[in-house]
């Protein structure tokens, strides 16, 4: 086992705090409408320019291992927030840094770290309740566009495009963001269905760059049982080969000999084919296969209705314009099913939603409804250079996640105002002892950090902005950093999703609490000797062994 270096108490915390500050200072310059860009070196290709907090955080790895521990814990705040809410990563990082800095000062002054953490947790719970109470449901398309615009750093075109996409496919529909081949950013809405089953073998892949199977104008075979031998299917497979079209097989499973035979045929080029498992389980799987059948004009091959595999003909296969399959998802675009049949099926599912008493069943039925009634919207992001396209794509991804979050939990005034107003709810709150009360005060001060940073990035003194907003009792009154005016933020369209603000605060407090209560840090000790120069010394990188 390799030797370890160990630091204790304030030595460990000070080292980790340095790492926290390095990462947070690099991330927080991107906050707000006047946030700056960060340029990241890439091992190959052009450098990347971004204003996306989590992209900056992911690139930072420090040479000092103790400092790196602190940096990686704060990086965790950004990625957790990104995973849950899809946006708000920079806000979360700024909050975490503020809580850690204040918390470690209090620990150094002799306060009990565990009581401080209890105080912090209590304050965060109150602040989150305040954010939830002040949130307002998103009702209009214009509000969705505003949320998207703010998250895309004031890019109105992106905000409106996302609102249009959500209007077309609904909040439940599938919206993907791709890089365009042109300089224009455009929205493409295609009716289609996506389900969470990927290809059964990577040998089916047709696009190695994207690791995807792409089938144009495929025929689709739906089989509700396991497929373990292709013998009964040979007549229809020969007919498919003669038709010159690719084949998608959706079955409970395709195993053993059947899968091997399909793969061999695909590799030899005799049959363009892919196989995926049917979505869902039990009765729900049957229902979803039926949905796919209606969408693609297919007949489900099922012994329940007396159809055997050997009797399958080309007429029983479904058809679609295109099918894309990744390792996790399958998307069927433009099925040829009759519109009247699809509408009847949608009406039937809606009735089932009304009749069911189980929340779980209701949720699953709504998922099916979204898949049938929704569609696939593709936002193609264009730009003059590759660097510009990648930077814009980051912003569109953020904006899309933010609008989804807004549809989930509503909106609050943006620009850090909701957090600042939540600090008012902590006035007069005390803990069970002085140290807990100090923990509450830490959160109260930390809630000012995002708005201070937004103001400072805009070249305005943060303390003055904080003072002015706290004096005003209107919950929507705040500072619009874009225009540098004090306005009603909701009227001005400066709004944030409540879910993003809540998630940022929860994750920041969670990781900051862990850092404050750290009493020892352990890392691997550096190896002796600097190792042999590249290409020289002992083979296989053995030059740094201590013989």
From Swiss-Prot:
Statement: the UniProt record of this protein carries the keyword Transcription: no
Single GO biological process annotation from the record: protein refolding
One GO term describing the cellular component: cytoplasm
Induction pattern: By heat shock.
EC number: 5.6.1.7
Origin: domain of life: Bacteria
Top EC class for this record: isomerase
Binding site for ATP: 30-33, 51, 87-91, 415, 496
Region: Disordered, residue numbers: 528-547
Chief subcellular location: cytoplasm
Record keywords: ATP-binding, Chaperone, Cytoplasm, Isomerase, Nucleotide-binding
Catalytic activity: ATP + H2O + a folded polypeptide = ADP + phosphate + an unfolded polypeptide
Subcellular location: Cytoplasm
MF annotations from Gene Ontology: ATP binding; ATP-dependent protein folding chaperone; isomerase activity; unfolded protein binding
Quaternary structure (record): Forms a cylinder of 14 subunits composed of two heptameric rings stacked back-to-back. Interacts with the co-chaperonin GroES.
Protein role: Together with its co-chaperonin GroES, plays an essential role in assisting protein folding. The GroEL-GroES system forms a nano-cage that allows encapsulation of the non-native substrate proteins and provides a physical environment optimized to promote and accelerate protein folding.
Family under the similarity heading: Belongs to the chaperonin (HSP60) family.
Protein name: Chaperonin GroEL
Organism: Caulobacter vibrioides (strain NA1000 / CB15N)
């Amino acid at each position: 086992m390799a030797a370890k270096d160990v630091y204790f108490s304030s030595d460990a915390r000070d080292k980790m705090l340095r790492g926290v500050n390095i990462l947070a200072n690099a991330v927080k310059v991107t906050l707000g409408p006047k946030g700056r860009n960060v340029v990241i070196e890439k091992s190959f290709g052009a450098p990347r320019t971004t204003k996306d907090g989590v992209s900056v955080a992911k690139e930072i790895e420090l040479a000092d291992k103790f400092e790196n521990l602190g940096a990686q814990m704060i990086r965790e705040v950004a990625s957790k927030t990104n995973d849950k809410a899809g946006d708000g990563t920079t806000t979360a990082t700024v909050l975490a840094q503020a809580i850690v800095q204040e918390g470690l000062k209090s620990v150094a002054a002799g306060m009990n770290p565990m009581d401080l953490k209890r105080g912090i947790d209590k304050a965060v719970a109150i602040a989150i309740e305040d954010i939830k109470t002040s949130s307002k449901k998103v009702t209009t398309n214009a509000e969705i566009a505003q949320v998207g615009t703010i998250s895309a750093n004031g890019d109105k075109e992106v905000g409106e495009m996302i609102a249009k996409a959500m209007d077309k496919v609904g909040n439940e529909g599938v919206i993907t963001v791709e890089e365009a081949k042109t300089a224009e950013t455009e929205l493409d809405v295609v009716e289609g269905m996506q389900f969470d089953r990927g290809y059964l073998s990577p040998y089916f892949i047709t696009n190695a760059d994207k690791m995807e199977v792409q089938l144009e104008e495929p025929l689709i075979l739906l089989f509700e049982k396991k497929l373990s031998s292709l013998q009964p299917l040979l007549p229809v497979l020969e007919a498919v080969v003669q038709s010159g079209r690719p084949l998608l097989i959706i079955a409970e499973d395709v195993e053993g000999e059947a899968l091997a035979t399909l793969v061999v045929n695909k590799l030899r080029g005799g049959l363009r084919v892919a196989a995926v498992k049917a979505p869902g389980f039990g009765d729900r799987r049957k229902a979803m296969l039926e949905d796919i059948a209606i969408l693609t004009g297919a007949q489900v091959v099922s012994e329940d209705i007396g159809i055997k595999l050997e009797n399958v003909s080309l007429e029983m296969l479904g058809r679609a314009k295109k099918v894309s399959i990744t390792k996790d998802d399958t998307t069927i675009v433009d099925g040829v099913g009759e519109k009247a049949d699809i509408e009847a099926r949608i009406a039937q599912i809606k009735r089932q939603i009304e009749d069911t008493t189980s929340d779980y069943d209701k949720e699953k039925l709504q998922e099916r409804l979204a898949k049938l009634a929704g569609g696939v919207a593709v936002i193609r992001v264009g730009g003059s250079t590759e660097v510009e396209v990648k930077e814009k794509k980051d912003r569109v991804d953020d904006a899309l996640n933010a609008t989804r979050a807004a549809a989930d939990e509503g909106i609050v005034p943006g620009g850090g105002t909701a957090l600042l107003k939540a600090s008012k709810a902590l006035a007069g709150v005390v803990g069970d002892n002085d140290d807990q009360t100090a923990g509450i005060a830490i959160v109260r001060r930390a809630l000012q950090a995002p708005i201070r940073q937004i103001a400072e990035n805009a070249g305005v003194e943060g303390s003055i902005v904080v003072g002015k907003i706290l004096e005003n009792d209107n919950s929507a009154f705040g500072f619009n950093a874009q225009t540098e005016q004090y306005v009603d933020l909701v009227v001005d369209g400066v709004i944030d999703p409540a879910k993003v603000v809540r998630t940022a605060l929860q994750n920041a407090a969670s990781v900051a609490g862990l850092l404050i209560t750290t009493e020892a840090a352990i890392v691997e000790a550096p190896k002796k000797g600097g190792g042999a120069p590249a290409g020289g010394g002992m083979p296989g990188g053995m030059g740094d062994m201590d013989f």
